């Protein structure tokens, strides 16, 4: 027997285009596409479909950050309530909290000073803090003259998550 009789690919290549078309039709009929648990599979093989990155609104982020300041871990009913109130899924809230805890622990491991990990603040981290230029991301707080005490919750990041009533309170500058 010749090799082309055993290989359907060679056989369709050597035969007429009509035979190749028939072969193509056969494979299309045999292919099955299954989407299950976020995975797409052709004939049992395939890769996971990545869900698009969730974009949170500023209101959602404010509520999530505020809740994270209260507690780093949510019980199931708390998570369900928070998700429902923000129009998010419980999974989105769960993943956000996981990511936030991870980021928080990473910052603590780096010495609780987030400026050390910021390349724009590299030289400032080595010297005492001076009231030179405010960090780029702190424009709103510095424009309002709000200053956070250095030993507040989440050192160096508290002003990112301040609630609206905190912005109206003036705090004495700590030197």
UniProtKB/Swiss-Prot annotation:
Domain of life: Eukaryota
One CC-aspect GO term: chromatin
Organism, scientific name: Homo sapiens (Human)
Compartment(s) of residence: Nucleus
Keywords: Developmental protein, DNA-binding, Homeobox, Nucleus
Residue ranges for the DNA-binding region feature of this UniProt entry: 49-108
Gene Ontology process terms (BP): anatomical structure formation involved in morphogenesis; cell differentiation; embryonic limb morphogenesis; embryonic skeletal system development; epithelial cell differentiation; head development; inner ear morphogenesis; nervous system development
Name listed for the protein in its UniProt record: Homeobox protein DLX-6
SUPFAM superfamilies: Homeodomain-like
Residue segments, region Disordered: 1-32, 109-131
Biased composition annotated in UniProt, kind: Polar residues: 1-20
InterPro entries given in the database record: Distal-less_Homeobox_TF, HD, HD_metazoa, Homeobox_CS, Homeodomain-like_sf, HTH_motif
One of the Pfam families matching this protein, by short name: Homeodomain
GO molecular function: DNA-binding transcription factor activity; DNA-binding transcription factor activity, RNA polymerase II-specific; RNA polymerase II cis-regulatory region sequence-specific DNA binding; sequence-specific double-stranded DNA binding
Family: Belongs to the distal-less homeobox family.
